[in-house]
Amino acid sequence: MELVVKDVQNVLSVSEIIFARDFNEALIHQVVIAYSASTRQGTRAQKSRAEVSGSGRKPWRQKGTGRARAGSFRSPIWRSGGVTFAAKPQEHSQKVNKKMYRGALKSIFSELIRQKRLIVFENFSLNAPKTKLLVQKLKDINLKNVLIVTNKIDNNLFLASRNLYSVDVKDVHSIDPVSLIAFDHVVITVEAVKRIEEILS
C-alpha cells in the first residue's frame, strides 16, 4: 500500500495489515469510551449526615410541641445538614487490553486514509515558535481543524499551536483514539508513520 507524500511529490510504502484494516466501529466505540472514562477525575465528594459537623442531640422532645418530630440537627432536610446519598470519590477507568487498543488505532488510521483525512509530509516544521507562521502554513494547504503528529515533539510547532483551539500537536507516543477522530484532518510526518508502523506491528 502506498501513501502520497504531499510536500515532495513522492510515495511512501506502508503495511496493509496496519493501514488497510476494515472499519471496526464497535471496537473503536469501546476503546473511545474507555479512554474518555479514564480521563475523568472522579474526585467529587459530599458529606453525608454521618460526616457533617453538628450535635447528636435531639432538637426537641418527640411529643407535645406541635412541631414535626425531629431526631437530628444533621438531617438532610435541614439547613446545613448532610447530603442524601452523598457523592464519594470513585475510579471510572475501564480495562482495555493492548490488542484491543492497537486494533482500534489500526482501524482509525485505515479509515482516515479511506476518507482522505490523513495527509503525509516529509517535513512539517516551523523556523520559529510563532502562531502566525503556523496559521499561514495551514492556510497554504487549506487546513483548519487539524491534528499534527510528529515523531518527536517539535518545540516550535508545539508553542505555535498552543493559542489555536482547532490545532493540536502530538508525538507518536502521545496520540490517542479520541484525538485522531476529533479533528477534521491529521497531518503526519514520514518518520511518524514509520514509527507508528513499528509500534502497531
From Swiss-Prot:
Region (Disordered), start-end ranges: 44-68
UniProt keywords, alphabetically: Ribonucleoprotein, Ribosomal protein, RNA-binding, rRNA-binding
Pfam families on file: Ribosomal_L4 (PF00573)
Keyword Ribosomal protein assigned: yes
Record SUPFAM superfamilies: Ribosomal protein L4
Annotated InterPro entries: Ribosomal_uL4, Ribosomal_uL4-like, Ribosomal_uL4_dom_sf
Gene Ontology terms: cellular component: ribonucleoprotein complex; ribosome
A GO BP annotation: translation
Disulfide bond positions: none
Domain of life from the UniProt record: Bacteria
Keyword Zinc recorded: no
GO MF annotations, alphabetized: rRNA binding; structural constituent of ribosome
HAMAP family: Ribosomal_uL4_B
Oligomeric and partner information: Part of the 50S ribosomal subunit.
Described function: One of the primary rRNA binding proteins, this protein initially binds near the 5'-end of the 23S rRNA. It is important during the early stages of 50S assembly. It makes multiple contacts with different domains of the 23S rRNA in the assembled 50S subunit and ribosome.
Protein family (similarity comment): Belongs to the universal ribosomal protein uL4 family.
Name listed for the protein in its UniProt record: Large ribosomal subunit protein uL4
Natural source organism: Buchnera aphidicola subsp. Acyrthosiphon pisum (strain 5A)
Lineage summary: Bacteria, Pseudomonadati, Pseudomonadota, Gammaproteobacteria, Enterobacterales
Gene this chain is encoded by: rplD
